[in-house]
Amino acid sequence: MRVTKELLIKNAEEVVRSQADADSSLVAAYLTGSLLTESPLLGNTTDIDLVFVHAGLTEEREFLRLTEDIHLDIQHYPKNVFEPARNLRADPWLGTSIFNAKPIYDPDHFIDFIQASVRGMYHLPEN
């Protein structure tokens, strides 16, 4: 089977959909990392970077192996880490992650709101 960017995104969407059905605390999920670039594969290997936002506390990180060459790297955060959203502009890890994110699961537009807040004035020196 030929691994393509589209196939990887489809796999990510299926995992998120399955998780959303199984976990009522899931508020949102977004894709980040190399899969959002032009060339996400290094050779024929890659990982799929996902961020899950939960209503409350949860485990921090998990790794799931889809195939020998493809892994899911899932970071879990409680919703309150993203509030207030404007503070994320100065956060080198989450700010960049959410700025470039591709929302996959966002029924209440939580990620949309956070992205709008982060992207506003993001490139000013104080941020």
Task: Go through each PLM region and give its residues.
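Catalytic metal-binding acidic patch
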Residues: T32-Y77
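Helical scaffold of the NTase/Pol beta-like nucleotidyltransferase catalytic core
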Residues: M1-A29
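A short linear-motif detector with a strong N-terminal bias
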Residues: L7-N11, A28-T32, N44, V51-H54, ...
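A generic local structural motif
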Residues: E14-S18, L36-E38, E59, A90
